[in-house]
A protein has these predicted regions:
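Amphipathic alpha-helical hairpins
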Residues: 38-39
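Short Pro-Cys-Gly-centered "Cys-loop" motif that presents a nucleophilic cysteine in a tight turn
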Residues: 1-29, 33, 43-213
């Protein structure tokens, strides 16, 4: 476990807020589970997210070890990051994150779990840590309209296929988006960002072959 009591959650979130400001990372959604956490974030530069997480770890791990008289690392390996196609998946990821406590049977209603951004998006508690994404603002013209629309989206839940897709992408670090999105991203970062295509490569169409000049 990485969070054992309320103070652990509060201290972690305070350091996360400090680090997000320092390294210019916009936090759109989060959940702190007993043994892991999820963040939906937009860093201002390519190193912002990793620097933020390193800074938080350098502060939180010593605090946790002192408090519970333990030594060693707290996390199992480096954090995993997934690039997403915002237009297609951002709001789905937001709901996936905030419904995590429900899927884990910690609560029945996400509103009953205090350590996530759901209360902010649902309009029951403003959270200064959260930077509302433009796609959240697009849910309505007023805060009231946005909150009602978001609560309805969460009430609808996610399909089993959506949960599986997001879970696999998170655990494996694959980009989350269409094949065109992944292809464009691979050209930018010069590495594979999704699972390898199965099967043999297709044979060239004979009608497209050219005679050597």
């Amino acid at each position: 476990m990485i969070f054992r009591d309320d103070d652990d959650h509060r201290i972690f979130l305070a350091w996360l807020a400090d680090a997000a400001r320092q390294f210019k990372v916009a936090i759109h959604a989060y959940v702190l589970m007993p043994n892991h956490l999820h963040l939906l974030a937009s860093p201002a530069d390519k190193d912002g997210l990793s620097r933020m997480m390193q800074w938080v770890g350098r502060h939180y791990v010593p605090y946790f070890n002192r408090k519970y008289e333990r030594v060693g690392t707290l996390y199992q390996g480096r954090f995993k990051a997934t690039v997403i196609d915002s237009e297609r998946y951002l709001m789905t990821c937001c709901r996936y994150i905030e419904l995590n406590p429900v899927r884990a049977a910690l609560v029945v209603d996400p509103a009953d779990f205090p350590w996530s951004s759901y209360a902010h998006h649902a309009g029951t508690h403003s959270n200064p840590l959260i930077s509302d994404h433009g796609l959240y603002w697009a849910l309505g013209n007023t805060p009231f309209e946005r909150e009602i629309a978001y609560r309805e989206l969460v009430r609808q839940g996610l399909s089993a296929e959506e949960v599986t897709t997001l879970t696999d992408s998170t655990l494996k670090g694959w980009a989350l988006g269409s094949s065109q999105f992944r292809t464009t991203l691979e050209k930018t970062v010069q590495r594979r960002v999704g699972p390898a295509r199965r099967g043999r490569p297709p044979r060239p169409d004979p009608t497209e072959e050219r005679e050597p000049e």
